[in-house]
Amino acid sequence: MCELLGFSASQPTEINTLVSEFFSHGKDNPHGWGMMSSSGMYKRCERADTSSELKRLVKKLPPQTTYLGHIRFATVGSIKDENCHPFSALDITGRSWTLIHNGTIYSASKLIPFVHHQSGDTDSERLFLYLMQQLNAAQKEKPLDIYHRCELIDDLVKDLSPRNKLNLMIYDGELLYIHKNMKQTMKYREHGAGVIFSTNALDDAQWKDVPTAQLQVYKDGKLVFEGTKHNAEFVPTLQYINANDAMHI
């Protein structure tokens, strides 16, 4: 499966060692890497752990207040730059939204129309385009403050979680939204002036499990919103487990 990395802090914090460890997992997720930092957004369809470009970016990475990282194991969509995460766009107010996703969308007919509008061919990009459509529609009716943005994202993840694996991180230029609906697939711990989130623990420190099936929203390293706990936990079937094991052979 893909792996996700997120960071939110109140002041610039050095995360190079943790980021380097995260991207070393590229050998098991060889189909691309991507990152969003204060230096910009970069993504390539190459192995993260052998990418000279990525090594240079991580080495030069300045202290961060917000960071997103992704390594891809392709399950839906071909292997090309357009299918690598993050996905990013401006809403109608000029706010920048960025998404990384780990999972598969098995059931979501409302995403089908976006097949004709996406740059690549992943379900993750269709998910992002649907998110942007819903945000723009809501903002045409009224401005969305922090609370209303949290409510909207909470409603979206509750709506899309049933029968889908929806582990994701979203950054809107101010808030970091965290959601997982499969147990033991995302952890977090405090780091410096903030909190770091990762699919897998990145060192020997004490990591905690991110709550399952409940949106968590952070601002400047602090939890500012908890969504409604929902029941759409993704429980992998034997077929799902066997298919993922086969892809790693």
Residue ranges and their predicted role:
Residues 2, 97-107:
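Conserved beta-strand-loop-short alpha-helix elements that form
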Residues 45-57, 71-94, 111-113:
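Short acidic (Asp/Glu) patches
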Residues 15-16, 77-79, 107-110, 178-180, ...:
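Short helix/loop capping segments that flank catalytic or ligand/cofactor-binding pockets
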Residues 184-219:
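A conserved acidic, glycine/proline-rich C-terminal tail/linker
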Residues 107-138:
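Glycine-rich phosphate-binding loop plus the immediately following alpha-helix
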Residues 1-52, 178-179, 195, 213-215, ...:
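Extreme N-terminus nucleophile/cap motif
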Residues 141-182:
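Catalytic core of PPM/PP2C metal-dependent serine/threonine phosphatase domains
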Residues 67-70, 167:
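A short, Trp-centered hydrophobic/proline-enriched beta-strand micro-motif
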